[in-house]
Amino acid sequence: MSGNHNQSLERALEIVDLAAEAGADALKIQTYTADTMTIDKNDGEFFIEDKKSLWKGESLYSLYQKAYTPWEWHQAIFQRCKEKGIIGFSTPFDFSSVDFLEELDVPFYKIASFENVDLPLIKKVAQTGKPIIASTGMASLAELGELVSTARENGCMDLTLLKCTSSY
């Protein structure tokens, strides 16, 4: 779903309904806040100046504020998924989001491309004992090896790697 809900819970639930009607087996959301992703700064590496970018003139912080799925919506979204017969799950971006998702008893986790080298996060997720789907992104073969060994050494025996594009 990503930020396609445009900060509307009604729209988020409609996306779940439409995904189910279209025959989807699962629906993934992302669990983070602007504060857990970056700092509130409007210059340097935290500000988008690329003239070709859709987000030119935006700070990363403001983009994350616009795109995040409010944590208080997660339960309603996952409940709607259950009602519609599809699996709701999420991509965590930090320890607090893993802890929160564990409270909601998500069935498995997705690791984003840019987090596939965050070995402390991989370890934390693997220690839940739940399956992990990890995007390969731009990771090297050595980095993917570290991801796999970290996941396995910390309890994840059901690991799927997805080849994906990291630049759109």
PLM regions: where:
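Short, small-residue-enriched loops and turns at beta-alpha junctions
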Residues: N4-H5, A34-T38, K66-A67, N116-V117, ...
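Hydrophobic faces of well-ordered beta-strands that scaffold small-molecule active sites
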Residues: L27-I29, G88-T91, Y109-I111, I132-A134, ...
